[in-house]
Amino acid sequence: SVIEVIETRIGGISDLRSQVAPKQVDRLVEIACHRFHAVMQSKPVHDILNGKITEWYLFSRLHKTKLGKYKLHISPDLVWFSGKTCHLLRFTVQGVSKPGDDKHLENVAMVEWAMQQKGLPANYERYIVENLYWNNGRWKLWRKRCTERDLEDSKHMINSDMRAMID
């Protein structure tokens, strides 16, 4: 079982053994492997692995970005270039079938992060914002070119949300 493999690697008894049935752990790992193999076949990951996308970078969402008086986690997971266009992608392990405006604007905030980074375009028009999300048994890709209105609406939403949390 997966728990036995974990225990061999850690050299002791895993806390999982008392919390989750071994068959349930095995099933969760099977699901994770299915998702992993599926994402390897999805765009843009497949294009990176096949060399169609040659200029790409990974970033940590743990990096904070200053937006006004707030420090936020708004960086993308993956950035790549296609000509002069810069793509900003975030992975969502469990997404909804039709992301609402709030999720769209949350993703647009990645452009704020990008425009503060050395080596990335300073012009919002050069960005395509993307989200690769898992829904109904497959990976789906949402994408949209950034507009000035999107960027302003994103900043407004973030400021409203932050004020609501502080009040």
Residue ranges and their predicted role:
Residues V5-R90:
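Catalytic cores of nuclease domains that cleave nucleic-acid phosphodiester backbones
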Residues S1, G12-D15, A21, K98, ...:
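Serine/threonine-rich low-complexity intrinsically disordered regions
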Residues E55-L151:
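Mg2+/Mn2+-dependent nuclease catalytic core
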Residues P22, D26-C33, D101-L105, E148-K155:
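Generic detection of long, well-ordered alpha-helical segments
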Residues I3-E7, G11, E152, H156-D167:
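Accessory terminal regions of nucleic-acid processing enzymes
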Residues A32, F36-P44, V111-G119, M162-I166:
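Hydrophobic, Leu/Ile/Phe/Ala-enriched alpha-helical segments that form helix-helix packing faces
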